[in-house]
Amino acid sequence: MLSAITNTSPIDNEFFIEDSRVYFCGIYEDTLLKGVSPTDFHCWHYWGKGSSSCYMGGIRLRGADAASFQALNYAYAMDISAVYTTSGRISGADISTFQILDNGQNDFGAPQGYAKDKNNVYFHNGDGKVKVLKTADVCSFQSLGDTYFAKDCRHIYAYGKILPKADLNSWKLIGHLYSCDDTHIYYVNRKINAADRKSFRLYTPLTAPSFCDLLARDDNNCYINDEIIEESYWLDRLKRVKDECMSE
């Protein structure tokens, strides 16, 4: 995935060349990679390496082996002796069996995703250390591809946590982080206790931009995410969502 650097102008979360030097374009400032030559620098999004050093954005990965370093996806990279996330190394990961399970990027463009080795299942959301899913069955565990939801032979997982009381056989995705089984409605990894399963309906279009409000309702309540709100406010938010969809 790593290829020779070609950018000559700043692009958010990308490396670029200026005045024969390599920089990383961060959200708030550009970072100079000291001592790095653009002639042998290879990169992919915010993973990069020179002849003797490796980088996650503008941060040098201490001890990383440049010869074997490779980007696996947006959330994970590895070399001959370690696995890296955008928050640092995964302690104890088995290099020979480590595998990514999705593309490592959520719908907001942030690094996030599931991975596993012969011993453990991992979830990384770009905020803090990677989470080890200690109850997960390694052999049967699979990501559902959106970096939020996953399952194994015993449980459904959402954002790295077991979905409470979810029935494995009847569970399905509704859309926009909502899901359900025969008796429950969920938002991400939280059960919406007040929701009526039979009448619950998602109103935010599946094609809506990721920043739109997530709106749903049933016969009894109106919801934004998993919060009950007044119908008048809900209708106003729904109009805005529809307007945002029309403007896309």
Where are these regions (language model features)?
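Non-catalytic tandem-repeat scaffold regions and their flanking low-complexity/translocation tails
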Residues: 2-248
